[in-house]
């Protein structure tokens, strides 16, 4: 299966090849042992790319993919295994030992903390834990109305599909929050509106992270600009983009799951 045919993708392939080449020597001769593995558990369109960029300001952390939306599942050797292989189907099982071996070639093993952000991992925590030791999970959710708007706009999805998808994500995250001991959960709203407090929570959760800088301008993709911007809560603007008809269709599903929304601090919007 062809991954891409664009010029940009071929440039990315050159970058990845050069990165693996340099990592081979630095990891082989200077790499640390006993790494800590940090997995961002976040549904799509919930601010996970922004969170990834913030955490990547730490001098003690390495992200396995610095391009695009920064997801480990999009690296060339694993894209067909993960991204193109029914990522949201829980009955599909990935070869995690092989995936880890590939990711280790991209991580800077001179860093103590090795981080991945792959959205579909919210449904694969149990499998991940079987392969990775010293593991930490940093979970995040976002107002589901804002997430639904992103799914509709970016994926050209129907409100019905987007609403059901968002609810399924919340169900998975509720399970992860309740059953994963070594985990910390935050919300997109907390990250944007009280970033200093969230940064302190994260550093208390994994002290080896050291200092992180949330005051920079970040290039996480959003509907306002493809350029860099300061952290800003975009929920209100996104939710206002939903039409009255779309909102009614969304609420036909959300009204049946009020308790689930309330669990994460969200409520019905009419």
Regions found by a protein language model. Give the residues of each.
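Short, well-ordered coil loops that connect the C-terminus of an alpha-helix to the N-terminus
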Residues: 57, 61, 134, 208-209, ...
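A short, structured active-site edge motif that brings together acidic residues
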Residues: 66-72, 140-145, 215-217
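Conserved alpha-helical scaffold flanking the Walker A/P-loop in AAA+ ATPase domains
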Residues: 101-105
């Amino acid at each position: 299966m062809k991954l891409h045919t664009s010029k940009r993708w071929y440039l990315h392939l050159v970058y990845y090849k050069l990165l693996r080449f340099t990592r081979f020597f630095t990891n082989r001769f200077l790499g640390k042992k006993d790494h800590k593995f940090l997995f961002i558990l976040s549904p799509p369109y919930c601010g996970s790319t922004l969170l990834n960029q913030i955490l990547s300001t730490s001098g003690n952390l390495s992200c396995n993919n610095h391009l695009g939306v920064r997801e480990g599942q999009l690296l060339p050797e694993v894209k067909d295994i993960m991204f193109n292989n029914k990522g949201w189907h829980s009955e599909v099982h990935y070869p995690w030992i092989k995936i880890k071996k590939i990711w280790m070639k991209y991580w800077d093993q001179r860093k103590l903390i090795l981080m991945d952000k792959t959205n579909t991992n919210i449904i694969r925590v149990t499998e991940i834990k079987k392969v990775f030791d010293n593991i930490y999970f940093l979970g995040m959710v976002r107002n589901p109305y804002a997430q639904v708007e992103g799914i509709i706009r970016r994926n050209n999805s129907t409100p019905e599909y987007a609403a059901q998808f968002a609810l399924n994500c919340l169900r998975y995250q509720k399970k992860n929050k309740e059953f994963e001991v070594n985990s910390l959960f935050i919300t997109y709203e907390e990250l944007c509106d009280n970033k200093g407090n969230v940064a302190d929570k994260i550093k208390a959760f994994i002290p080896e992270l050291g200092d992180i800088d949330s005051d920079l301008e970040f290039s996480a993709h959003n509907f306002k600009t493809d350029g860099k911007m300061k952290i800003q809560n975009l929920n209100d603007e996104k939710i206002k983009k939903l039409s009255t008809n779309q909102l009614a269709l969304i609420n036909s599903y959300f009204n049946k799951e009020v308790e689930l929304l309330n669990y994460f601090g969200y409520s019905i919007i009419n």
